[in-house]
Amino acid sequence: MPDYRSKTSTFGRNMAGARALWRATGMKDEDFKKPIIAVANSFTQFVPGHVHLKDLGQLVAREIEKAGGVAKEFDTIAVDDGIAMGHDGMLYSLPSREIIADSVEYMVNAHCADALVCISNCDKITPGMLMASLRLNIPVVFVSGGPMEAGKTKLSQHGLDLVDAMVIAADSSASDEKVEAYERSACPTCGSCSGMFTANSMNCLTEALGLSLPGNGTIVATHADRRELFLQAGRTIVDLCRRYYQEGDESVLPRAIASRAAFENAMTLDIAMGGSTNTILHLLAAAQEAEVDFDLHAIDALSRQVPQLCKVAPNTPKYHIEDVHRAGGIVAILGELARAGLLNTEVATVHSKTLGEAIEKWDVRVNRDQAVHTFFKAGPAGIPSQEAFSQSERWDSLDLDRAEGCIRDLEHAFSTEGGLAVLYGNIALDGCVVKTAGVDESILVFEGTAKIFESQDAAVKGILGDEVKPGDVVVIRYEGPKGGPGMQEMLYPTSYLKSKGLGKQCALLTDGRFSGGTSGLSIGHASPEAAAGGAIGLVEDGDKILIDIPNRSINLLVSDEELKARRLHQDHKGWKPAAPRARKVSTALKAYALLATSADKGAVRNKALLDE
């Protein structure tokens, strides 16, 4: 049987000093025989998705202690992408993922913790903690802060979210009063933004990976039912410790659970629910930490065979995450995928022997148990709040309509191909990604004229200044992991195109990335990026670009000879923006850029450079 890792600092005469320090944290004699479990919290008052987490780490800690473990809490940083958006703050968002992963590794390994509970929620925190847990490969359970309730206003016939506020603010025909009404209504409670944006997508994917409990991605942050998830996480992690350290059961380790098949399940779910394109970036990064052979080509293959079974904001204004929960949550989508033969149900989870057993227990179409149905009736209260577990409202009924409801069965899928696609061509030899769930059918094939911008700032200025016309392909380059640095999100450019009435008349191509709130023909992650010599850096104003989503291609309609000549010229000139950018890049960001790979590799560090 493996020894507790913590024995390194708690056992033997020579560890008297370390034990003295442990005692100063409150440990007693009997505690030195128990597993020490790290609780990685991410509380901050900067982020609505994390503002309510302050006491939840201790809630988990007390449950761990009741179950026979010793709990030690620490916090990671957390960046709010929405607040960091539209200025140089966004340069720090993606790099913060690596900082979070490293900080969890540092704390757990420095103190020889035996296991880990990850309390995450928003965009880079869940991926960062996921990368760390797979890197460490000790027992782990994820529990998130939960999604925000959708906003409401008398001026709108549907739920509101952050993107609605951004779009209307850029609409010159909207009155100041209307803009203010949206601003005050779009984000009414604590929690991760209410649509199928990056944060909620990732929290849902942890369910498919088998590392979190049912409901983790969908119970709203304010609902009392979410409290039980935190308590159950505390009990579960102690049980996983017992099975690994006392019984030698390696099947409970995260790399055993998050296998190649589990990653395929997670990506299948992502495609079926039209998740954020950022999830591709994060799953690729996590797979590398898990030492799983999972790449863009695998994602491309899945995207061609998985239908879209769920459609949520920003892909439709009709549904938000709270509606997914009412329809049976992530387990309901997994159940439909399993019945369609698109899921590996033999993979393990932290809460069930197999995913198949979990579906049998939690899928509302399979299990008619009243307790299960009551669980999925947990809904929003419509009361502004920054407190966790502050309400206990329930829907009168579930959404079990698999023909026209929020979640569909295979026969009634929103589309036969899923909500994400990988495109290849001479402008992106290593691939790029598009959220097809947000693309109007009329522009699935689009030939347009390149309009070049050397930064997001320049693109925003150009769009608002009416430089972009119908039929243009807005190209924003040198915004990749290395070139930005930091691979900024392009939510403002896409929102402004939408507000200008160009959402169905233009395309946007970038080596940067997009917010989960993005819709329209928005193609990101172009790889290699411009700063790494990618062909996106060779496009010139007026070039024709052909985008063909059904055939998964994107090409610059320029001869190979012309591209070769342009490349020779650019090699001589250097792969840098043609127009100077007023951008201050700190030493920390320069260090990130030095090691960053392009998006097709997950924008992780280039380990080959470290080996040198």
Swiss-Prot record:
Belongs to the IlvD/Edd family. [2Fe-2S] cluster binds at C122, C193. Pfam families: ILV_EDD_C, ILVD_EDD_N. Keywords: 2Fe-2S, Amino-acid biosynthesis, Branched-chain amino acid biosynthesis, Iron, Iron-sulfur, Lyase, Magnesium, Metal-binding. PANTHER family: D-XYLONATE DEHYDRATASE, D-XYLONATE DEHYDRATASE YAGF-RELATED. GO terms for biological process: isoleucine biosynthetic process; L-valine biosynthetic process. The active site is at S515. Its cofactor is [2Fe-2S] cluster; Mg(2+). Its EC number is 4.2.1.9. One of its GO terms (molecular function) is 2 iron, 2 sulfur cluster binding. It catalyses: (2R)-2,3-dihydroxy-3-methylbutanoate = 3-methyl-2-oxobutanoate + H2O; (2R,3R)-2,3-dihydroxy-3-methylpentanoate = (S)-3-methyl-2-oxopentanoate + H2O. Pathway: Amino-acid biosynthesis; L-isoleucine biosynthesis; L-isoleucine from 2-oxobutanoate: step 3/4; Amino-acid biosynthesis; L-valine biosynthesis; L-valine from pyruvate: step 3/4. Homodimer. The modification N6-carboxylysine is found at K124. It comes from the Bacteria. This is Dihydroxy-acid dehydratase. One of its GO terms (cellular component) is cytosol. Binds 1 [2Fe-2S] cluster per subunit. This cluster acts as a Lewis acid cofactor. The gene is ilvD. It comes from Azotobacter vinelandii (strain DJ / ATCC BAA-1303). The keyword Cell inner membrane does not apply. Mg(2+) binds at D81, D123, K124, E489. Functions in the biosynthesis of branched-chain amino acids. Catalyzes the dehydration of (2R,3R)-2,3-dihydroxy-3-methylpentanoate (2,3-dihydroxy-3-methylvalerate) into 2-oxo-3-methylpentanoate (2-oxo-3-methylvalerate) and of (2R)-2,3-dihydroxy-3-methylbutanoate (2,3-dihydroxyisovalerate) into 2-oxo-3-methylbutanoate (2-oxoisovalerate), the penultimate precursor to L-isoleucine and L-valine, respectively.
